[in-house]
Amino acid sequence: DALAKGGDLFAGYTPEAIRVGDTAGDEPHASLYDAWGEYYRLYRQRFPDKFLFCNLFPAGASAKKLGAKNYAEYVAQFVEKVPADFISLDQYPFFSISLLKGIAFRLCLHTYDVVASACRESGRDFWLYFQTQGNWFDLIYALPSFEQIRWQAYAALAYGAKCLMHVSYTP
């Protein structure tokens, strides 16, 4: 909305020297990509020494949530419209519910494949949040073992990931 009004998006913003960048958002609908692309350009112009972070959905989100007919289109539209130097996402493949366990690895590897291909084709880095804890949100995620954490890291690196990240949620 502020972008459409044409005002100074950063008028009340003071970048702190200790902060390397900012977050644009998390898991956007593809309909936001045009605005995000413009925001990225303006941010880079105003703060050339900082970087703007965003994080996409992994494969498995519905077409309605993605705003695209499938995951490959969702990622391709991001690459086309948002001038980020990387594609970042979170992928949590270990579930405590049996039904989800069967599809989780296929979705995980599909995510890695789509994003890695898009990164290679566009010259971007592949960044990944991987699963290091369980039982948050709605208790569907399993606590991964050391071997499962290692598998995620090695699999992501095999697909060309350049940055591996994790989060820690606490009550």
Model-predicted segments: where are they?
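Glycan-processing catalytic domains of CAZymes
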Residues: 1-171
